[in-house]
Amino acid sequence: MAEDGSEEIMFIWCEDCSQYHDSECPELGPVVMVKDSFVLSRARSSLPPNLEIRRLEDGAEGVFAITQLVKRTQFGPFESRRVAKWEKESAFPLKVFQKDGHPVCFDTSNEDDCNWMMLVRPAAEAEHQNLTAYQHGSDVYFTTSRDIPPGTELRVWYAAFYAKKMDKPMLKQAGSGVHAAGTPENSAPVESEPSQWACKVCSATFLELQLLNEHLLGHLEQAKSLPPGSQSEAAAPEKEQDTPRGEPPAVPESENVATKEQKKKPRRGRKPKVSKAEQPLVIVEDKEPTEQVAEIITEVPPDEPVSATPDERIMELVLGKLATTTTDTSSVPKFTHHQNNTITLKRSLILSSRHGIRRKLIKQLGEHKRVYQCNICSKIFQNSSNLSRHVRSHGDKLFKCEECAKLFSRKESLKQHVSYKHSRNEVDGEYRYRCGTCEKTFRIESALEFHNCRTDDKTFQCEMCFRFFSTNSNLSKHKKKHGDKKFACEVCSKMFYRKDVMLDHQRRHLEGVRRVKREDLEAGGENLVRYKKEPSGCPVCGKVFSCRSNMNKHLLTHGDKKYTCEICGRKFFRVDVLRDHIHVHFKDIALMDDHQREEFIGKIGISSEENDDNSDESADSEPHKYSCKRCQLTFGRGKEYLKHIMEVHKEKGYGCSICNRRFALKATYHAHMVIHRENLPDPNVQKYIHPCEICGRIFNSIGNLERHKLIHTGVKSHACEQCGKSFARKDMLKEHMRVHDNVREYLCAECGKGMKTKHALRHHMKLHKGIKEYECKECHRRFAQKVNMLKHCKRHTGIKDFMCELCGKTFSERNTMETHKLIHTVGKQWTCSVCDKKYVTEYMLQKHVQLTHDKVEAQSCQLCGTKVSTRASMSRHMRRKHPEVLAVRIDDLDHLPETTTIDASSIGIVQPELTLEQEDLAEGKHGKAAKRSHKRKQKPEEEAGAPVPEDATFSEYSEKETEFTGSVGDETNSAVQSIQQVVVTLGDPNVTTPSSSVGLTNITVTPITTAAATQFTNLQPVAVGHLTTPERQLQLDNSILTVTFDTVSGSAMLHNRQNDVQIHPQPEASNPQSVAHFINLTTLVNSITPLGSQLSDQHPLTWRAVPQTDVLPPSQPQAPPQQAAQPQVQAEQQQQQMYSY
């Protein structure tokens, strides 16, 4: 070991020679040393991102603001090692004063034990101080006392009450004529407003005049409570105490937040007074003229002095502090109607003054909304007594519940808690206080008053998730859900927001005795007595519930449904359930058209004209948030504020054009528009858009997004007891449970069809509106429901994942497989009473009866006029009598502009040897295909002499059947089947009547030559109807669009340009194929961009070349007279490339 004063020698142990060496091993050499990486201390690594540490010129370090810090920004709590006594006091010592009075010291000597707040330097002068340190509970916090601009160093000093406990002086104001205590140096008035205000009764100092006013009113209350003989003594300390210059006087105990006055039990029959810590931070400014105020206060002649009774003497001090013209405080200031100097009277005095002065001022100025806000938690109250009662909750909680160890600040709160929470052995007769609105019962009257059930709309809205609540207490409970889940159940590890809820949940896992104290639950241990709640059974139906409260709610369902929805007629047991139900109707307004919306609004008693001026505003997240910028009035609910600005200021607010709701705030309106998916590119709306990063769905609040994300976790903890289906959320399970009921309470206003769930009704309404949000990526077909789109997509893949283990049959859907299994298990139990056909499920039987046996209005075949009575008969007729006809209808061209030019004045059919027959198209029947006449095959000599009518709507001609050039086996002569029919109904742009229609005469008929291996069995014709709506005209040009049906490949092709692709023959097919062709012309027409342009390889649709052999030049048909002037189609134009989609 080295001697004292010498450097310590580091010895290194060598494993090889088993010796210590002071430098290096003589045989193996030096040791390679690896040092740790540099790690910031805890104090420096915990620095917030908007702060930074800078080194000053004198070498010291300070904390500086990077961004703007507004006033009343709180930092903390201060973290450090806590000791009973300091070894060495720091430059800014901190203590925490416990309930028993013993202080605990903060050891700030080590940066690794503290957070960044230890690096903030204390202020030396008052103008340098911008942070205030104070104790709250068992921690110390820093709060900004003014706005701090970027680049300013943070400097801290003690708050007034905390400085008194720490026995530290307040900082003095440098360069002003006011002492640190706020007492003027001389009697001359100070021009500038002092930064601190002093009480002339007890010399307490205050940073704000408002705090001094409320403090003086406390002295007034004390003077009023003293007997008459003692009042002279109460007014004695009116002299200004001589204080040494630069040394402030000791701050009295009255300046502490947790004052003795707050800890006193309030006297019976008297409202507790408001201490200075309870001062309102949001005060309504009074805009009444100052002359009127002077007139109110003038109760004495101008020259008559005022008697100096103690209460009036203190009120003299109050008014003297508020009068800018006052220079003598020995008497009440004299106000006259003709004073030239203006009088400034703070609204805080009007709101807080007592007795006659307060009554007189309120009587003259009129009642105004009063706002009282807690200094500590910023909670708002409507009156000072509630604020006084609330502030005590931030102080010491001396009353402990013996049952659950919960602490209370008032004994009354403890009694109410014990009576309400721990009276489980009382009989049901003790529930004698019943709510007249929802019929909920309570044991004590105060619990009924706290219940505060409302019958009007939910007006309290959460700022996080925008959810509405009927009472402020329910909103406060709900807000805790947005915090962290800190309490875990020891049995199942489930997390909770509140400890009391966790303990109640944990009791459900326990078995044994009936009563268990919460101390035993918190202590835990192996010897913990098990407890289980005694179940409660319904006396009507016998259903068992885990607790009596749930049973009481269920018991209401056996009573009469007294509350009826005026919109849909549905009845409810409780009015709060009815109120929630009415909100569902408003959610579906967006799916209605203008007529339906007007009818709906009229049904609920609001007209659209009145809606512009008298619409209600959804309530805000917290009462008293709305403040009118013009008259400074505040409102507790949004509809009150909206009514105010409409009636008083003649403003209309912000109205939603979709659902006709109106909002007073623009921010609320923008958040509402996210629901309708409107104005999403607007930056004002985008800040309310919260997209899901997994599926891309957007929400207008973080709370709704977080609830949605539960679906993506894959955890489905809520299972249906009837079918076993699981869900991620409890509300989804409740919605699903309606599926098992046979009650279809949700009726469609369009068709009257009943739905079991609101979700199903919303999707059903989309069908009536034609809203199809989901598109197949393969064929671009759109669907209204996602489940139908997913089922459709499986047809493209051909994957069948589900197999019946009994017979081996595979299915693409699980529900289809489950239905099939019923054949093996229960058999076909449902028999048709008409034809004795049997089915597995009742639904299949109902569909059979509906389609087969139910008589409907007689339907006529559009081709031959045959009338049938059922849909099944019509399908059977078309299948047997007209197998060659395929109808393709275009019913909706809403996406096209008003005037459209389609690059297709004709639709040509490329087929072997076709014959087109004339059809009589009835006038005024727009969109219906003409009846098909009988097929006629004329001989060539008859064709030549056949006259062509001049007024024919369609050209009629026949061509001689030609043989195929290649060998196609026995199918050569039968390849040409029935006549190809093309019926096109278009709006005539030359006719003014929109309902008129003309036949398209420019039909291209092209015989084709196929390869030897190509086989045809049944070439199906096309009937195209409703190509345009009666309100819209289409301008046509002379270009030709040809549609080809390939029966081998089963695809439809378009011809519009020369064939420039070499085609290879196809292999021979084994058997002829009969193909049913479907072509979506709506997709074709709407996808041409720009309209009128030629189709090309760069078309938005996916096109592929279809093999085709060289096309023979067509034989020209005999053209009718009206077609004589049209140009003939050249042979080279017939050799076109075919594209399939």
Curated annotation (Swiss-Prot):
PROSITE patterns xrefs: SET, ZINC_FINGER_C2H2_1, ZINC_FINGER_C2H2_2
Gene3D superfamilies per the UniProt record, alphabetical: Classic Zinc Finger, SET domain
GO cellular component, one term: nuclear body
Tissue: Detected in all tissues examined.
Compositional bias per record (Low complexity), positions renumbered to this chain: 1121-1141
Enzyme Commission identifier(s): 2.1.1.-
Zinc finger boundaries on the chain: C2H2-type: 197-219, 372-394, 399-422, 460-482, 487-509, 536-558, 563-585, 626-649, 654-676, 690-712, 718-740, 746-768, 774-796, 802-824, 830-853, 859-882
Function description: Sequence-specific DNA-binding transcriptional regulator. Plays a role as a molecular node in a transcriptional network regulating embryonic development and cell fate decision. Stimulates the expression of upstream key transcriptional activators and repressors of the Wnt/beta-catenin and MAPK/ERK pathways, respectively, that are essential for naive pluripotency and self-renewal maintenance of embryonic stem cells (ESCs). Specifically promotes SPRY1 and RSPO1 transcription activation through recognition and direct binding of a specific DNA sequence in their promoter regions.
Protein name (record): PR domain zinc finger protein 15
Taxonomic source organism: Homo sapiens
Gene field: PRDM15
